């Protein structure tokens, strides 16, 4: 009887090992068919070589004087560093990007004990991508909007000092992804 239990126990262990092996093999076969995608890889037609990113104007009701130049510079830097495109400053560029900051508003986003605890700064940008290399190509409109929460104990200028780098980085990333990614 003791021998029978050992044989039975051994066959159960063998069965478990076989099942685990088959499961691992199945998962590996599924993963082998997957491609690795790079989220920072831009999708640009080969004939496009130059881009003109115009100054992004601030047409929002409230005007943060630092935002327009910093966002424009960050977007230009991102495009030059993560694509093969060359930034030019003339109307002969293959791609022409123009636009403006359309919204820069603060609203209440959190209330605690009947007092404002958190404010939200919402920044929106509207851009147009013009493809001069492809005759008859329609301009592509792009909208990017991000919200940033900050403590209600801060004034707007104090919050802007804390949030400025994050605002510029996040908006530039979103604009870049909408301009060049096929996601």
Briefly describe each language-model feature range.
Residues 74-75, 96-100, 171, 182-183:
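Structured catalytic/translocation cores of nucleotide/phosphate-coupled proteins
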């Amino acid at each position: 009887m003791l021998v029978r239990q050992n044989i039975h126990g051994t066959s159960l262990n063998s069965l478990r090992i076989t099942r685990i092996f088959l499961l691992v093999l199945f998962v590996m076969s599924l993963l082998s068919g997957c491609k690795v995608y790079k989220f920072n890889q831009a999708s640009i037609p080969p004939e496009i070589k130059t881009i003109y990113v115009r100054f992004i104007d601030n047409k929002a009701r409230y005007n943060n004087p630092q935002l327009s130049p910093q966002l424009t510079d960050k977007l230009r830097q991102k495009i030059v560093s993560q694509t093969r495109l060359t930034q030019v400053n003339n109307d002969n560029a293959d791609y022409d990007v123009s636009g403006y900051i359309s919204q820069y508003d603060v609203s209440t986003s959190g209330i605690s004990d009947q007092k404002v605890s958190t404010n939200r700064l919402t920044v929106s940008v509207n851009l147009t991508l013009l493809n001069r290399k492809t005759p008859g190509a329609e301009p592509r409109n792009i909208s990017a909007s991000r919200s940033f929460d900050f403590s209600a104990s801060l004034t707007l200028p104090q919050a802007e000092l804390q949030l400025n780098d994050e605002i510029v980085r996040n908006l530039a990333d979103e604009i870049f992804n909408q301009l060049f990614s096929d996601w």
